[in-house]
Structure formats: structure tokens, C-alpha cells
Amino acid sequence: MDKNNLVNGFTNYETFTFVLWLDNDKKMHDLALDAVKTAYNKNLRLSNAIYEIQSFLETYLHQNIHDNFTDFYRDMIVNSINKINTYEVAKHLFHNYVENYQIEQKTA
């Protein structure tokens, strides 16, 4: 991937926007953090932990598409959601959690 085409370090605008919302919306942040903690506490291989978080994110995204969006708007919303690189987001969340957890352990 050409690093010049990244949006603030992420694959695309949709992925970057999703990460912003995860970081700034308490409910979304807490749900994602719970998924990350669960994967981390299972002592899974890194790839399996990231896959588990990615699965959670994909389910979350698609479960929250409201049925009142129909036709054109639903198609546009689903298309944008499908552009989100959930693997990249899961990896980002996991690495941030591990980094913060290690910092907490050092200061405790």
C-alpha cells in the first residue's frame, strides 16, 4: 500500500472515521475495549486475537445499520461500512491496549 494514500495512517477515510468514533464515543469505546480485553485475556496467538476483535467489529458495524434506511441510503451506508478495514482497526486497538497495559504494569 502506498503510504502517501493513507488517511492519518489508516487505509481510507472510512477506516479513519471509524477509529475516531471508537476513540471518542464512550459506548463504542467501551464495547470495543471489552472485546480487546477478552481477546487479550484468552492468551491467544496475536493473529487469533486480532481475528476475534475483527469479528466483533464486523458484527457490531452490521448490526447497527438501521432498518429505516432503505434503497439508496442503505446502499450508500452499507458500501461505506464495507470499506472499513476492520483487520487494521482490530490490530490498532489490540496494540494500543497492550501498550497501555504494559505502561500500567510498569507504573503499578
Question: Which residues are covered by each model-predicted region?
Answer:
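Acidic interaction surfaces
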Residues: 1-108
